Swiss-Prot record:
Protein name listed in UniProt: Sterol regulatory element-binding protein 2
Annotated site residue numbers, Cleavage: L464, C465, F502, S503
Gene this chain is encoded by: srebf2
Transmembrane annotation, as ranges: 462-482, 514-534
Leucine-zipper: annotated span: 370-391
Lumenal side: 483-513
All copies of domain bHLH, residue ranges: 320-370
Classification via SMART domains: HLH
Compositionally biased tracts (Low complexity): 71-100
Region (Disordered): 65-107
Keyword Transcription attached: yes
Annotated GO biological process: cholesterol metabolic process; liver development; positive regulation of cholesterol storage; positive regulation of transcription by RNA polymerase II; regulation of Notch signaling pathway
Assigned keywords, A-Z: Activator, Cholesterol metabolism, Cytoplasmic vesicle, DNA-binding, Endoplasmic reticulum, Golgi apparatus, Lipid metabolism, Membrane, Nucleus, Steroid metabolism, Sterol metabolism, Transcription, Transcription regulation, Transmembrane, Transmembrane helix
Length: 1099
């Protein structure tokens, strides 16, 4: 900015003063300032004057340089010894003589009239304050100057004011600039005091270098601000300052202006400015300057205001009015812009960019949205209040107090920060807000909890029921009614003329009269019984906790419930137990801890269940508690039932160490709450609750009192028949089948997760007893199928393999498409969200089915089934157990054996047999405490492997068609499998019969003595000769032994001649009965060959 532009922005009120300024005026002012050192007593420090005000020797007014013949009025404070002179006005005129200065000396000062006035001023508060002032004046062509001033003010108790002596001023200047000192002091006093301004100080000049006289040719002007005391229309007074900044201008040097700011106190802090203007040159016209910004300190609107300046003629200039108007408009626009920016930050955020109209439009839309939400919530709040008043009229006052305590309305800040109106509630403020995209956190409706939401222990309920039954047994009503009989009657006072029967008077001897006398007692007993039942029913709802919807209690419950779901999903069962217990505590429900609590809870749950189940009592329960069973009550019962149900599941599966009776109490609580929830639970969830309760009762009682779990199971089955929704999943449907019910009630099972079960079934939810029970059922079906395949039970069966296929078919139906059984909670990571299949169990079922068809001789079915069995599930590959690997190698060997290839097929089949034999040997050596299923599968695999080796040996015959001695590799493999069979025979009785058969076979394969082999076969066959009506263990092995003897032993050993035919006929009947078609075909071939040889010999 150049000098011309700066001059245009100067205050027009100073233009009339600048035309008369000369260099001599400025020099004389400098001399006046420099000569103030002659009065050192004025600036002595007066720090010790605390109680009394010291009087100055003389009053020194503020000197202001003005043009000639132009008087200027300044305000100063005159200190006197008394405070009564505070409102007097003293006019002093000082006359000085004019002199002509030399060329290098300041010219004489013209006569200057200084008028000092003292006027009262009203302030709010006065504080003692010492504030240093520092001014830095930096011309463009010269180094910087530092001007420092310090004013010390003190007020005593006598409401007088004292101006202390400022410190010595020190100025550091450069060699090219004349040192100077500028000092200004201003003091504001309370009402009734005066204002005094002193400007004097000795000056000390420190010269850096060049001790050469310097000609000061730039004038320096010092002008103070004036204080104006204006009166507002309402009668209050506002202190304002007229800021008159001046500028410095020279012909060749830019202007440098600096304002000295001195804080004073008026009700808080008032910031006024003291402009200092320095310049050089001859007469410099002072133009209009822009006023400084307003300062708002301490909440009071006290600022620097631009007031119109009166010219010599007393007329306000037009430019000054326009400047004042522009300043006011600029202030208004700045305030509006600030509020619009604040509104944008509230509605759109700090990063949003939008023009003013868009911000206002968004704010209007948001206000309308809040009004709609407020109206909706008020309507809902009114509805809930009316319902609460209708249901709980006795607690209306308490609820209203809680509502008043909880509802808090917050009004937005006023748009005008300077408004002094008290804060009022906004009509658009709401006490609750739903979630909206403009809010970061969803605020839920805050409602008071109902008085019935406080739960009690079950022992308190049981105590009330016991008291009711005690009243029924004692029945005090008849005694109370009997005490009201008249005491002065002759029948009571003395003996009557005749005898009485049953203490009845003579006129009541008839049956009708007797019944009329007994009827009141019967009515009393009936009324007492009904009252006791009604009291027990009332106990159901007296302290039954109910959680209001969308209340803080409901929010806390769902927060912990979701946390429990997440912990169950991650497998953190200990944390899930704590979260579920917290859920119950939020719902004001208490779990039993001690033995007394468990017994009381069990008794109360049984009483509660008995009150609902019978038809008359159930009708009474619905009649009494109908008005209590609202939507909130049913929802609370549903939430609590699911939590109790999950805790019972965790206790049953071993994830929570509690006693079995504790689990029974929790499961019965879930059943009762499920009955209270009614339609809030789906049919699948209700069936799960009842089945879990039956499992808990069955696990606690064992095989005793099986009628109780059977009753709960029948209730669950009745729910499945009543539901019209989609059918139950297979994981629940199997338990209602006859075989599933028999397994549940009579078999031994455990719902705790076991690692050994993962070999035969897929992994299930460790925290779901129904899933674990389903796993046990699948393992039981596999066990029954395996043992049925190993040993037949009776001849009444249609065939040995028929029962096996039935078990396997039921197993496939149970594992075909099973939905997840944990509907209220998310499935585990190893479960699918749509359906849960058991690929491991189905693989074992396909292997057993292929074994049955291979024994039956159905090679086509064997090839199709083994093609599927060769794709072993990934879970078994990951498990890396030797038994599934042995079974897989056996399946590949059987697959190669049924192929029509001869040479290469036999070699490949034997190699697979070697691998299967090695894995089986490892599995047998590792098994110590395995289940019957594990041992049965090992025995079956070993038997099938030995049977396959025997078949391969018989297939590779010699030149005459009969098989010769087996090679050493085949014989060593057969011996290793036989040793594994001997080891399994120690714990399994059926292995002894198979062991004798395969020991005979190995003698034939090795070419041992046929006489000793015949003796062994004859001893075994004679020991197992049975009657026609029985089928004992080892019958199939005896038939195979007969076939070996008739096929491989010499004919002379089988004497007499008819004995061989009888043995073959018996073996044929046995093989037909067990369904072994492959061995039956061999038996028929031998019979045909035997009959052909007999015919030729006879001819």
């Amino acid at each position: 900015m150049d000098a011309s532009e700066f001059m245009d922005t100067m205050d027009p009120s100073l233009s009339e003063l600048g035309d008369e300024f000369t260099l001599g005026d400025i020099d004389e002012m400098l001399q006046f300032v420099s000569n103030q050192v002659d009065f050192p007593d004025i600036f002595e420090d007066q720090m010790g004057g605390g109680a009394t005000a010291r009087t100055l020797p003389q009053a020194v007014p503020s000197a202001i340089l003005t043009p000639p013949h132009t008087p200027v009025q300044t305000s100063s404070q005159t200190h006197t010894q008394t405070l009564t002179q505070a409102h007097t006005q003293t006019h002093t005129q000082t006359h000085t003589q004019t002199r002509t200065p030399p060329v290098l000396q300041p010219r004489p000062q013209p006569i200057t009239q200084v008028q000092t006035q003292t006027f009262p001023m009203q302030t709010l508060a006065v504080q003692t304050q010492a504030q240093p002032q520092t001014v830095m004046i930096t011309p463009t062509a010269t180094p910087s100057r530092f001007i420092q001033n310090q004013v010390i003010c003190q007020q005593n108790n006598a409401t007088s004011f004292q101006v202390l002596q400022p410190q010595m001023q020190s100025i550091m200047t450069s060699p090219q600039v004349q040192p100077m000192t500028i000092q200004h002091q201003r003091v504001l006093t309370p009402a009734g005091q005066t204002i005094q301004t002193l400007s004097t100080a000795p000056t000390t000049v420190h010269t850096m270098s060049q001790q050469v006289p310097v000609l000061v040719h730039q004038p320096q002007i010092l002008k103070t601000d004036s204080l104006l005391l204006t009166t507002k229309p309402d009668g209050t007074q506002v202190l304002s300052t007229v800021q008159s900044p001046t500028g410095i201008t020279t012909l060749t040097t830019p202007i440098q202006t600096t304002a000295l700011q001195m804080p004073t106190l008026m009700s808080s802090n008032i910031l006024t400015t003291v402009p200092v203007v320095m310049g050089g040159g001859d007469k410099l016209p002072i133009k209009q300057l822009s006023s400084g910004p307003a300062h708002n300190i301490g909440g009071a609107r006290v600022g620097v205001e631009q007031s119109p300046v009166v010219g010599p003629g007393g007329v306000v200039k037009e430019g000054e009015r326009r400047t004042t108007h522009n300043i006011i408009e600029k202030r208004y626009r700045s305030s509006i812009n600030d509020k619009i920016l604040e509104l944008r930050d509230l509605v759109l955020g700090n990063d949003a960019k939008m023009h003013k109209s868009g911000v206002l439009r968004k704010a209007i839309d948001y206000i309308k949205y809040l009004q709609q939400v407020n109206h909706k919530l008020r309507q809902e709040n009114l509805t809930l209040k009316m319902a609460n008043q209708k249901n709980k009229s006795a607690c209306v006052s308490d609820v209203d107090l809680e509502l008043k305590a909880e509802v808090s309305l917050i009004s937005p800040p006023p748009s005008d920060s300077g408004s002094s109106s008290p804060a009022q509630l906004s009509p658009y403020c709401i006490d609750s807000e739903p979630g909206s995209p403009l809010l970061e956190h969803e605020q839920l409706k805050s409602e008071p909890d109902s008085p019935s939401c406080v739960g009690v222990m079950d022992r308190s309920r049981l105590l009330l029921c016991a008291l009711s039954f005690l009243c029924l047994s004692l029945n005090p009503l008849p005694s109370l009614l009997g005490a009201e009989a008249p005491a002065g009657s002759p029948e009571v006072a003395g003996h009557g003329p005749t005898r009485t029967l049953f203490s009845l008077p003579a006129q009541t001897q008839s049956f009708g009269a007797w019944l009329w006398c007994v009827l009141p007692f019967l009515l009393v007993w009936v009324v007492s019984g009904v009252g006791v039942v009604w009291g027990c029913v009332r106990v159901l709802y007296l302290w039954e906790p109910v959680t209001p919807l969308h209340s803080p209690t409901s929010v806390r419950f769902w927060r912990h419930r979701k946390q429990a779901d997440l912990q169950l999903y991650r497998g953190d069962y200990a944390g899930a137990v704590l979260s579920l217990q917290t859920c119950l505590s939020v719902l004001s429900r208490v779990l039993p801890v001690t033995t007394l609590d468990i017994m009381c809870s069990l008794s109360w749950n049984l009483i509660r269940y008995c009150l609902r189940r019978p038809a008359p009592l159930g009708w009474l329960v619905r009649l009494v508690g109908g008005r209590h069973e609202g939507e909130e009550s049913q929802t609370s019962s549903r939430d609590a039932a699911l939590v109790y149900h999950k805790l019972s599941q965790l206790q049953l599966t071993g994830q929570m160490e509690r006693r079995p009776l504790w689990g029974v109490c929790v499961s019965l609580s879930a059943v009762n709450l499920c009955e209270s929830a009614e339609g809030k639970l789906t049919a699948t969830q209700q069936v799960q609750v009842y089945v879990t309760a039956a499992i808990s009762v069955r696990a606690a009682l064992g095989k005793h009192l099986t009628c109780l779990p059977a009753y709960l199971l029948s209730c669950a089955e009745a729910l499945t028949c009543q539901s019209d929704s989609k059918p139950l999943p297979d994981c629940l449907r199997w338990i209602f089948t006859p075989l599933g019910r028999q397994f549940f009630l009579s078999c031994d099972w455990s719902v705790r997760s076991e690692s050994d079960g993962q070999i035969f079934t897929s992994a299930r939810d460790k925290a779901d007893p129904i899933a674990q029970l389903h796993r046990c059922f699948c393992q039981k079906l596999l066990e029954r199928a395996t043992h049925t395949l190993i040993e037949p039970q009776s001849r009444e069966d249609a065939g040995e393999f028929t029962g096996v296929l039935e078990f396997l078919q039921l197993l496939n139906s149970c594992t075909e498409d099973s939905a997840p059984s944990t509907a209220p909670f998310p499935a585990l990571a190893n479960q699918s969200s749509t359906s849960v299949r058991d690929p491991v169990c189905r693989w074992w079922a396909s292997v057993l089915t292929a074994a049955v068809h291979w024994l039956q001789g159905d090679d086509a079915s064997v090839r199709s089934l083994l093609a599927e069995a060769e794709r072993m599930p990934r879970a078994l590959h990951t498990l890396d157990h030797p038994l599934p690997k042995a079974v897989l190698a056996l399946c590949k060997a059987v697959q190669m054996s049924v192929c029509p290839q001869k040479g290469e097929g036999v070699v490949s089949c034997l190699s697979h047999c070697q691998r299967a034999s090695a894995q089986l040997h490892i599995s047998v050596c590792q098994s110590h405490n395995n289940t019957w299923l594990h041992k049965g599968v090992e025995l079956l695999v070993c038997d099938l492997l030995l049977t396959l080796r025997t078949s391969l040996w018989q297939r590779g015959g010699g030149s005459n068609g009969e098989p010769g001695p087996a090679p050493g590799s085949q014989l060593s493999g057969f011996q290793r499998d036989l040793s594994s069979l001997r080891r399994l025979g120690q714990a399994h009785r059926q292995a002894q019969h198979k062991l004798f058969l395969h020991e005979t076979t190995v003698r034939l394969m090795a070419g041992a003595s046929p006489t000793r082999t015949h003796q062994l076969l004859r001893h075994r066959t004679h020991n197992y000769t049975t009657t026609d009506g029985e089928c004992v263990l080892g019958e199939r092995e005896r038939a195979h032994a007969i076939l070996l003897a008739c096929r491989h032993l010499p004919l002379p050993l089988l004497t007499p001649p008819g004995h061989r035919a009888r043995l073959l006929a018996e073996a044929k009947r046995t093989l037909e009965r067990v369904g072994d078609r492959r061995s039956l075909q061999d038996c028929q071939h031998i019979l045909l060959r035997l009959s052909g040889g007999t015919t030729i010999a006879a001819s």
